[in-house]
Amino acid sequence: PLYFKGSMLGGYPRELQVTLVDIPNRNVIEDFTQGRLDIDTKINSSYDIKIIAGERSYVVQMVEEILADIPEQYSLSQNYPNPFNPITNINYSVPRSGSVTLAIYNIMGQRVTTLVSGNMKYGYHSVVWNGLDQSGRQVSSGVYFSELSARGFRQTKKMLLLK
């Protein structure tokens, strides 16, 4: 295990606030000079934290901005436009950095193409599907499904391609 403990040599000005934001857990340790963060290195090979120091009003504003950029849960939004021809946008949210897959399937459940596959940083993301399959061929009109999967999460949305 690895742990962080905040301290300052010789004390610090009374108006200074030191706050740590534990990104993966959306946890805020407001007075980090008195706090401690434990990280299990067997589970985490990398870990995102942010430390903010300054006057209280500045620290509060920065923490709010940081947390606003971190989704609370995985989600897959409905594509837009829908119906589409031939291009559509797909937005999705990733609350924790890690492996994510976003794939397109046809009405028979066959994978048509994979738009995203690999490690993604936490945040709000967008990808464009141009109506092409994995081989670069234009797919026919019809119903398709976008599916986001990550860490046991799976969500599917129905899309309609009209030509």
Q: What do the PLM-derived regions correspond to, one by one?
A:
Residues 1-14:
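Proteolytic processing hotspots in large secreted/extracellular or virion-associated proteins
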Residues 159-163:
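Short beta-strand edge segments in extracellular beta-sheet folds
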Residues 29, 112-113, 139:
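Generic structural signal for well-ordered beta-strand positions
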Residues 26-69:
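Short, compositionally biased serine/threonine- and acidic-rich segments at solvent-exposed termini, linkers
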Residues 97, 116-151:
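Short, surface-exposed loop/turn motifs with a glycine/proline- and acidic-biased composition
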Residues 153-157:
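Extracellular and select intracellular beta-sandwich modules with Ser/Thr-enriched
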